[in-house]
């Protein structure tokens, strides 16, 4: 879209930017400055088209879907101090069928993107609804995986086990 937008193309020229990727980083930097002035943190999606994020403040956290880091960008950004939120498609894309992202996978994933816990700010589930035809299907795909993810997010490493979660899930189902 930005390639076709006259205002975006004008902003690229006026600010001496190379392309639409630079425009996104320019825009996110402005948003980050504003949010920081109000006492908030910024989070943006790490996406495949970025080759270099050096112009982007390292205090903007990234959600990382784990589609691969062939260019070493995520590793470089970690070295710069960027915080990451794990939103790996396996197991945190809840629009994927249970055969791809099983309840056990969600429950037993440690949430870490690296060996150092402090580098991962948290975990996040995705529910892309373009292939979810109705609320019944949405609920089926989301629950109890969301409960397993929540238990996993605030639990000690290695807890809950899958069997422990299944035992606790009885109470969880009563709340639904």
Language-model-derived ranges and their functions:
Residues 1-62, 67-80:
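Active-site neighborhood of glycoside hydrolase catalytic domains
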Residues 49-58, 62-174:
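Conserved alpha/beta catalytic core and glycan-binding cleft of carbohydrate-active enzymes
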């Amino acid at each position: 879209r930005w390639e076709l937008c006259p205002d975006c193309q004008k902003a690229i020229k006026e600010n001496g930017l190379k392309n639409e990727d630079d425009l996104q980083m320019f825009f996110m930097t402005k948003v980050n400055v504003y949010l920081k002035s109000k006492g908030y943190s910024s989070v943006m999606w790490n996406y495949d088209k970025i080759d270099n994020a050096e112009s982007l403040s390292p205090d903007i956290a990234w959600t990382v879907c784990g589609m691969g880091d062939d260019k070493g960008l995520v590793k470089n950004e970690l070295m710069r101090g960027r915080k990451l939120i794990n939103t790996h498609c396996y197991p945190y894309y809840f629009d994927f069928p249970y055969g791809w992202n099983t309840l056990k996978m969600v429950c037993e994933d440690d949430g870490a993107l690296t060996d150092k816990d402090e580098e991962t700010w948290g975990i996040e589930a995705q529910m892309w609804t373009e292939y979810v035809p109705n609320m019944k299907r949405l609920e089926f795909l989301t629950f109890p995986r969301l409960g397993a993810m929540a238990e996993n997010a605030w639990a000690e490493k290695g807890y809950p086990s899958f069997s422990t979660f299944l035992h606790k899930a009885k109470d969880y189902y009563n709340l639904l």
